[in-house]
Amino acid sequence: MLAPLFAAAVLASSGGLSASCDLEHPSGKAGCTRAAVDALKMNQLQAMGTHNSYKMAIAPLEMANLRARNPKAADTLDYSHIPLTDQLNDGARELELDFVYDSKGGRYTTPLGRKMAPATTPYDLAAMSKPGMKVLHVPDIDYRSVCPLLVDCFKEVRAWSKAHPDHVPILIIFNLKQDQLKVPGAVPLLPFDAVAMDAVDAEIRSVFKPGELITPDQVQGKHATLREAVLAGAWPTLKRARGKVMLAMDESPEVVAVYRGARKSLEGRAMFVNTDESSPAAGYITLNEPIKDNARIQAAVKSGLIVRTRADADTWEARKNDTAPREAAFASGAQYVSTDYMHPDTRFGPYEARLPGGGVARANPVAGKP
């Protein structure tokens, strides 16, 4: 239940929309008309998403081996997700896909965890043998995915999107895995150099067609930089953004620099990038600590940036039923709030993270009027 003062703040900041108005399915009643909702800019929503959306559970024997060696790591990796289509049906509007580069195919077909516990759950060797980006969390340890090939993940999201053309924009964020696991016998990871970055964009554009993505170039328009466009309020309205997908690389400055190359912003690129608020490429930012970074998140949202934060991390909130980060995330105004628990894990307790009011998306409590 929203506190009355907070509900009033949402109403005031969202051009007269009620705090309970579901932006994906406006009721048509006063305070929730389709016209009023569609007049909002896409950065004026707030929606839920999932963290490491592709992640399947580590097989029991492999988890037992990991727990015997590193109980804390085992705890932090002890979560999983349902297929992407089911998550989207459940209201997730932000997904996270982590991937490794596999230009020739077959690099990740023999993970150490599987070698140590061979009689475990099936592994899609056919998919892992193909060339292309492979979606997984930790090579050799936490490597099972609901969609092992990045392009297959894209195809699943696109199919759902085409079947639900009125959905609010879906954000997909990416971690590009290239840090070597310091374990004897671990597979060497390939670096994301300029060639690999171009290959990522090529995979994106092999699935999503022009007009199905919200791209940096579209937002930048005639502005000198993406940041200038965002500060000037250049995000599309919800009317224009419905049925579309936005992609963002959530990576270090060094990795982002390779993707940007000599570009002033992100000209010609398919993805937005996580960067600091002052960068010419600023449009999206990841700030995953909603308590510590609450003021920074609010400032970024008010300036026009789109922010992703987390309601929980590493299973700790679920184990302790600690709702403080979740509530701070909602109050921060971050447009996309990520969780591992859109439903409780009954092993731990009642903790879950769902948008206040129960809708798919609501008017952002911080972003302001259109």
Question: Where is each model-derived feature located?
Answer:
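Bacterial N-terminal signal peptides
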Residues: 3-13
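Catalytic cores of phosphodiester-bond hydrolases, prominently lipid phosphodiesterases
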Residues: 13-370
